[in-house]
Amino acid sequence: MSVPKFKRLPSGLDYVDNAYELQKEVMILASKLSARWARIYQQPIDEYACKQADFVNMAHSINIQSVEDYITRRWLLKMSRAYLQVLEKRLMDAIRILYMNPSKCFSRKNGKNYTTSEATKMLDRRLEVLGTMFDRQYTLIKGVLDSDNKKYKKRDYDNISDEEIIKILVSKYFQIIFE
């Protein structure tokens, strides 16, 4: 029996799947902001969530065959981690806003709002899930970087200078931008 398309995950790797799930959960939480605060916070939060998932997907698509591949993949994973840190900071700012009036964040199917205590509990549960997802993503990215380092050291590549690394990164960056 096959899995329906809407239930399929984009990849079989944990760090890619977790990035996708994290992006989805962050966007759901950001959509709970009121219209006034959504104009300020929602677009950057959605952008950072998408960027961190995109960088993970790009890094996943690189199979390490050469020094260039290793450097590019490492750079993409570090950019994903940087976007993850910025996303976490921005999301915490938005969460402070949500906690100022939690009853307006969630509404029932009939359109009425939850009480403040119910809404606070719902927000706490959602934040707990997000916190574990963030921690897991940090751990997974660190694990991928460590395993890439081990593979790189096993292959015994020639020592490459910092200038060559910069040239490789700049060329790959512009190649990614113009594709």
PLM features per residue range, with description:
Residues 1-179:
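Amphipathic alpha-helical assembly/interaction segments
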